[in-house]
């Protein structure tokens, strides 16, 4: 997803050609190419969140960040004066109107097709991304989503 040119028409053939070009440019290895599911990528861009991302005039992918947090926010038993550096890489965020939408992709198997376990598992991570993006951009985060490739569904995290 990081190197996919989303300004192009993302047909199955176009995505396949782009992935082949990523191998030629050494952005992907042949082994990595083998696990790319072209159909899943294509289907993602047919979803509401995929269309919103594609329509945005500003899309940032694989954005790294470091933020300071009071240690007690993470673990109440720690000293109030302790500071923890929290770092991560946000899969994607994009502007929509004058706000930001955060999108994190997950390829995990969703047991029973129920996204609730994924929402619970990743809520803290996504809310940390929200804090980081608001500090980085100075904009309000409108919404945060997980896109679960296993079931082809976006779920909102609040």
Where are these regions (language model features)?
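Structural signature of nuclease core domains in nucleic-acid processing machines
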Residues: 1-158
């Amino acid at each position: 997803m990081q190197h996919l040119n989303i300004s192009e028409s993302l047909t199955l053939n176009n995505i396949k050609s782009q992935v082949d070009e990523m191998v030629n440019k050494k952005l992907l290895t042949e082994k990595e190419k083998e696990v790319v599911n072209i159909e899943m990528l294509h289907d993602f861009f047919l979803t509401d969140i995929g269309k919103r991302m594609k329509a945005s005039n500003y899309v940032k992918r694989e954005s790294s960040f470091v933020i300071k947090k009071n240690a007690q926010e993470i673990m109440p038993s720690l000293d109030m004066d302790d500071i923890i550096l929290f770092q991560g890489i946000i899969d994607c965020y994009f502007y929509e109107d004058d706000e930001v939408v955060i999108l994190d992709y997950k390829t995990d198997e969703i047991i029973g097709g129920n996204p609730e376990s994924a929402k619970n598992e990743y809520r803290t991570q996504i809310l940390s991304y929200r804090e980081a993006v608001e500090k980085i951009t100075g904009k309000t985060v409108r919404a945060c989503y997980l896109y679960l490739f296993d079931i082809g569904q976006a779920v909102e995290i609040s």
